[in-house]
Amino acid sequence: HHAIMNVLEPVFEKQFIFHTYACRKGKGSHKAIKYAFCKAKNCEYFLKLDVKKYFENIDHNILKRKLSKILKDKDCLDLLFDIIDSFSIEKGLPIGNLTSQFFANLYLSELDHFVLEQLKPCGYCRYMDDFILFSNSKIDLKKMLNSIESFCLNNLLLTLKPYILGKCKDGIAFLGYKITCKDVDLLRISKKRKKQKLRRINYEFENYFISKAKYIERVKCLFSI
């Protein structure tokens, strides 16, 4: 899977907006948090959304159509389709596979473009299936919510978890941190998650799933902001 994505990553990159931060070189959760903090300082309201059981509900036919639009090599497509169907026939991707991370990121890229080009909030960022919109109008965000729910259901066959719409000054829980217009604090619950992630990184390194350089990079990323 790593060899496949080393070749295909540049092709996928061309589909992504600037402010989507998962599974991309030079991005990551901490840059997503910094962007959200910047917007929280300059916008009054936020709308936080999350896809319900995202990986489990990725539709294979829709994903394959998206891949067919950006890749023209039949052998390559056949290989990717086999990987997709190896988990189940109609929908769902295994969370642990590297290809699944890229497929999942690509699946929502159409939504990213819809939000930025059609809805035009004051700010927008996405980390996999967690995303935030910013605006100075609560009414505008409610309208955007309706549009996004319809887009996800009709175009992607996805539904959203209950939304959170609030004032930035009251704080935004995002990727294990509480972001306000003044500062960024680590959520208490995320300390336990950090330990779990560290154990996972150590396991992957000790069992030769990742290189030493990648191990160091991920540990630094985990404990820095």
Predicted regions located by residue number:
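Hydrophobic recognition helices of helix-based DNA-binding modules
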Residues: V11-F12, V115, C152
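Short, well-ordered loop/turn and helix-capping segments at boundaries between secondary-structure elements
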Residues: S137, N154, T180-V184
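Right-hand nucleic-acid polymerase module
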Residues: H2, K142, T159-I225
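Active/ligand-binding-proximal structured segments within catalytic/core domains
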Residues: A3-L8
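Conserved polymerase palm-domain catalytic core
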Residues: F18-H19, R24, I33-K34, C38-M128, ...
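A common structural junction motif
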Residues: E149-L157
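Charged boundary/loop elements
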Residues: P10, K14-H19
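Acidic (Asp/Glu) carboxylate-rich active-site/surface patches
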Residues: G28
